Structures are given as structure tokens and as C-alpha cells.
Amino acid sequence: MGNWLLPESLADVLPAEARRIEELRRELLDLYRTYGFELVAPPLVEYIDSLLSGTGTDLNLRTCKLVDQLSGRTLGVRADMTPQVTRIDAHLLNRAGVTRLCYCGTVLHARPADLLSSRELLQIGAEIYGHAGFEADLEILSLVLDTVAAAGLRQPRLDLCHPGVVRAILDADPAAAAYAEDIVLLLREKDVPGLAELARRDGGIRADTAAALQRLPGLYGGPDVLQQARHDLPLLPGVAAALDALQAIIDAMPDVTLGVDLADIGGYGYHSGVTFALYAEGWHDALVSGGRYDDVSRAFGRARPATGFSLDLRKLARGLPPAGRARAVRAPWGQDAALAAAVRQLRRAGEIVVQALPGHQQSQDEFICDRELVLQDGAWTLRTL
């Protein structure tokens, strides 16, 4: 095996794609700033107990671990930047009011999410801390839509969920709550026969609980699903509150294509309120995901309501049309002071100037040189090619 081969599910990013990704990164961070979000940059590696504080087992399984040669303690390479940003808000900034933070950085997964996914992601996202009302959720959803619009996506679909529905059903039946992890997995896979078999095998799960859990995978579709859920599910306060929270979001966004999937409870042990996933044509799974996670900052000694979202910029860029080649100016290489001044002036004006080194022809695929610097009547001037 060649020494140049990369590990499985990792890849180099070549110039055209790297340029597209960097352009997106700059544009999106500038967009987030217009909303009042402040940029933070947590470290790539942290002590594992800090990195996983307040998160579920899913993040633990996705985290690559190593031993710190200075302290002997276990380190983790971040698989998600959100807990780090939560730590910054709760422990370092320690502000009393609303805080808006955004971020962009590399994350590494121990295993790919699926056969088509990479283990290395360039995660970008935004979080609002300090406001428990649905106004913060609406601002995050508006920013999500502006994010994909800035990338050129049209007519995306937002699917909403709320883990409070499942949580209320399980809390009302201790026998079912004992199998919470199994039930969550079966719901995410929409495995109705598996849910029925679990209830039959245990015997202690109440019939109404089993029926409600088996009904959940079928409760997906348009906003009218909420009305069906009120009819099909137990009249528990927690269920009603979760459905009301979803309805409030739907009522506030009449011009957005919204769906509801009450079994899409990824991050069940992490999220506390309305969650969402954004889908768009050209991507095989969710492009953006996020939601409310009010309990995570408690692990850092300061409970703060929180909601936010994140996406993988590499994944976003791969689904976009190929970027056009940038236009550039071709110039000779030389030590002439007037030539150097002309090149410097063009670059300061934002032009790309590629100087051909001696003995080489222009061969870069990244640029189209449609003009060149030529010496004419003793002065360096631009000529159209």
C-alpha cells in the first residue's frame, strides 16, 4: 500500500472545491454578523470529560480519543463544536442576557455517518443562549433559511420534531422508560414491528403506551400531522405542550415549506425542545440540523436556555453547481520596479495577477487569464486577450 493513501472516508480538497468552500465560509460568517452573532474559535482537542459534558452516548461514540502526553489524561478530537460553544457561553463569557455566537471549524468523526459521508467535516453554525421563548427558535430558523439562500438553494423543506412527545409518553410508563434507548432507536428507524415485539417481549409496557409508540412512525407529513397526533396520542400534558410548541412555529412561518416527523428524534438525550432538519434537492440526507437544548449548559455549572443549528460546509459545497473559474491578469516575471508597482496596484484593487515564472507556460486550471500586463511605450498597461 502506498504511503500517500489517506485513511478511509477522508479526502483531500482540491483548488476549485476549496475556493468554493472558503467563499461560502466568508459569506456565511458575514451573514451571521448582520444578525449580531459573535465569532468564537474553540480548540480542536479538549479533555474528554469537558468535551462530552451534557451530551448523550451518540457523541461519545463519534469522538476519536487519544492520550495527552503532557498530563496523561484522555483527550477527545471534537466531533461537534456545539458543546464547546456552550461551554464558552456558560463558563467563559458568563453573560446575564442573550448571547449570540457563531463558529466554523473542522470536526472529526470516529466513523462516517453512512457510506456516502466523510469522517472530516467543516462545521459552521450559530447558537442563541439566554432566551427560552420561541422567538429565539424563529430567529434561528430564519437564519437557516438565509444560510441556504446565500448558497443559492431554492425551495428547501424544513422538517420539525419535538422530543417532548416521546419523553412524555415514556415518563408516563416506567416499564417503557426502562427501554428508552431501544425505543428511540426503533422510532428513528420507523420500525413498527420492532416496537410491537419489544412491548410483547417485556409484557410490562401498558397497551396504550405500546399503541402510542407504534403510531408515532406514521405521524409524518405536512402541518396537519399535528391535528392527527392530538387525536391519536395520549392526552398527556407533555405531549400537548410539545405539539403546541410545534404549532406556534408553523403558525409563525406561513410562507415556508414545513413538514412534521414525530419519530425523527435524533439527539433525543440532548435536545429539549423543537428540533428541525432542512432538506434540499441534490443531497441524500439532511443538509442542516438543529434545535433547542436547554439542559446542556447545566453540566458547566450554569443552566442557560439555548437553541441553534449547524451544517457541514464541505457537504453543502459538493451539492452545488461547479464554480466558474476566476478571471485573472497574466503578467511576466521580472525585477523591473515599474512592473512590480503595476502588479501591486492591480492586486490592491482586488485583481488576481498571476506572474509566469521563467521557462513555464501558464497552466493553472483555477483561473482564466483574460488580460495581460504588457510593456507599451515604456509603461506597463493592461491588454485584453
From Swiss-Prot:
The keyword Nucleotidyltransferase does not apply. Required for the first step of histidine biosynthesis. May allow the feedback regulation of ATP phosphoribosyltransferase activity by histidine. It holds the Pfam family tRNA-synt_His. Pathway: Amino-acid biosynthesis; L-histidine biosynthesis; L-histidine from 5-phospho-alpha-D-ribose 1-diphosphate: step 1/9. GO terms for molecular function: histidine-tRNA ligase activity. This is ATP phosphoribosyltransferase regulatory subunit. Belongs to the class-II aminoacyl-tRNA synthetase family. HisZ subfamily. Heteromultimer composed of HisG and HisZ subunits. InterPro entries: aa-tRNA-synth_II/BPL/LPL, HisRS-like_core, HisRS/HisZ, HisZ. Keywords: Amino-acid biosynthesis, Cytoplasm, Histidine biosynthesis. It is found in: Cytoplasm. It comes from Bordetella petrii (strain ATCC BAA-461 / DSM 12804 / CCUG 43448). This function is generally fulfilled by the C-terminal part of HisG, which is missing in some bacteria such as this one. GO terms for cellular component: cytoplasm. The gene is hisZ. It comes from the Bacteria. Disulfide bonds: none annotated. GO terms for biological process: histidyl-tRNA aminoacylation; L-histidine biosynthetic process.
